UniProtKB/Swiss-Prot annotation:
Organism lineage: Bacteria, Bacillati, Cyanobacteriota, Cyanophyceae, Synechococcales
GO BP annotations, alphabetical order: base-excision repair
Name listed for the protein in its UniProt record: Formamidopyrimidine-DNA glycosylase
NCBIfam families assigned: fpg, PRK01103.1, PRK13945.1
Domain of life from the UniProt record: Bacteria
Function of the protein: Involved in base excision repair of DNA damaged by oxidation or by mutagenic agents. Acts as a DNA glycosylase that recognizes and removes damaged bases. Has a preference for oxidized purines, such as 7,8-dihydro-8-oxoguanine (8-oxoG). Has AP (apurinic/apyrimidinic) lyase activity and introduces nicks in the DNA strand. Cleaves the DNA backbone by beta-delta elimination to generate a single-strand break at the site of the removed base with both 3'- and 5'-phosphates.
Residues annotated as binding DNA: 109, 128, 173
ZnF (FPG-type) intervals: 258-292
Endpoints of the signal sequence: none
Pfam families tied to this protein: Fapy_DNA_glyco, H2TH, zf-FPG_IleRS
Length: 292
């Protein structure tokens, strides 16, 4: 599943490529992809003649702020124009966007297509079809419609995410620290890859009970999380299967991982063999010598 760095990579690509993209036509190829409104024609009608004004990210969610366009001669930019709600996207396991100039026939796993007046297309492709989209108008609350969005913990790059916060939320937790990092209500956007890599960087065993981790270790863990995420974003995220950026390129961070998917290989620090075991149903990779 795309995690924070992959979703941020997509966000940056969308922001760069779709500057002043006005949606003139929407085609839904798989209706189950649209989670809200339940009336799919309302989704299409709501997005038509909307300018994708700004792309944001919250955890693993992409959020496009929309502006209403009265006619084709409307002057850009539209800072003071009326808002037209939000287009929210969760890529889930295999979803990704592709920008296509002079649109061609859709490929097999195309789920939703957005066109501008010049027939340029923003195409959403999803092999396993777990991804979802929402169009939410200004009269409704994003957090109420999308329950997962409203329950997210702080962003790893935010001031709210620090050692004091971590100490408070884990003080009575008997869960493993790996399970804590995967909990989106505690910290948003971290998944299996970056939990493993961050714990390795911090020298903390993924099996440690969260409440046993000391303040100085949490300081290092927070710093490791930020460093690992920034490094991955700089490499365009990680591709092990389906993830692609807007240009169809793979992410390159997978070539730099220290433990993730390196089972049986030598630790880059100590030479000990990397091991793998499941925690809460998720494959976990670690170095038994470097992580305590």
């Amino acid at each position: 599943m795309p995690e924070l760095p992959e979703v941020e990579t997509v966000r940056r690509g969308l922001e760069q490529k779709l500057n002043n993209f006005i949606i003139k036509k929407v085609e839904i190829c798989r209706y189950s992809t649209v989670a809200f409104p339940t009336n799919k024609e309302e989704f299409i009608k709501g997005l038509r003649n909307s300018l994708i004004y700004k792309w944001d990210r919250r955890g693993k969610y992409l959020i496009a702020q929309l502006k209403e366009v009265q006619n084709e001669h409307t002057q850009l930019p539209l800072e003071n124009s009326q808002n037209n709600g939000f287009l929210v996207v969760h890529l889930r396991m295999t979803g990704y966007f592709k920008f296509i100039e002079n649109s061609s026939n859709p490929c097999k796993h195309t789920r939703v297509r957005f066109f501008d007046k010049n027939n340029n297309e923003l195409r959403y492709i999803d092999v396993r079809s777990f991804g979802q989209m929402w169009w939410i108008n200004n009269d409704l609350s994003l957090n109420k419609i999308i329950k997962g969005l409203g329950s997210l913990g702080p962003e790893p790059f935010s001031k709210d995410f620090n050692a004091n916060y971590l100490k408070k939320v884990i003080s009575k937790r008997t869960k493993s620290i790996k399970a804590i990092l995967l909990d989106q209500t505690i910290v948003a956007g971290i998944g299996n890859i970056y939990a493993d890599e961050s714990l390795y960087s911090a020298g903390i065993s993924p099996f440690r009970e969260a409440r046993t981790i000391k303040k100085n270790e949490l300081i290092k863990l927070k710093e490791s999380i930020v460093t690992v995420l920034k490094k991955s974003i700089g490499s365009g995220g990680t591709t092990f299967s389906d993830f692609r950026d807007l240009e169809g390129e793979n992410g390159n961070f997978g070539l730099q991982t220290n433990v993730y998917r390196r089972t049986g290989k030598e630790c880059r620090k100590c030479g000990n063999l990397i091991e793998r075991q499941k925690i809460t149903g998720r494959s976990t990779h670690w170095c038994p010598k470097c992580q305590k």
